[in-house]
From Swiss-Prot:
PTM statement from Swiss-Prot or TrEMBL: Covalently binds the prosthetic group of malonate decarboxylase.
InterPro entries, sorted: Mal_deCO2ase/Cit_lyase_ACP, Malonate_deCO2ase_dsu
Family according to the record: Belongs to the MdcC family.
Modified-residue entries (O-(phosphoribosyl dephospho-coenzyme A)serine), positions: 28
The species this protein was found in: Xanthomonas campestris pv. campestris (strain ATCC 33913 / DSM 3586 / NCPPB 528 / LMG 568 / P 25)
Cellular localisation: Cytoplasm
Protein known as: Malonate decarboxylase acyl carrier protein
Gene Ontology CC annotations of this record: cytoplasm
Source superkingdom: Bacteria
Function text: Subunit of malonate decarboxylase, it is an acyl carrier protein to which acetyl and malonyl thioester residues are bound via a 2'-(5''-phosphoribosyl)-3'-dephospho-CoA prosthetic group and turn over during the catalytic mechanism.
High-level lineage: Bacteria, Pseudomonadati, Pseudomonadota, Gammaproteobacteria, Lysobacterales
Amino acid sequence: METLRYRFDGRNGARTGLDHALVGVVASGNLEVLVERVPLGGAMEIEIVTAARGFGEIWQAVLDDFAARHSLQDVRISINDVGATPAVVSLRLEQAIDVLQGADA
């Protein structure tokens, strides 16, 4: 297992909604994403625990893109991955933010 950690400066607070959201299932080729509102001094932190080692650059690219679209303050995202593709990662992140902010996913 490999653990990757990222921190982004947030510019926007997440819209009102839930305190946390969990989407996805840890299974072959998938992942789960937990998003929580926590005091982080305005930052967004993302931690990934993955079975697929050596993909840090790909994770960085996917998360840079996500952070550019959702520059959220005081949000922690925890990802448990079992080899999901970048498209699935992006989908689950979008779903988690939608659920956190009160939209149906």
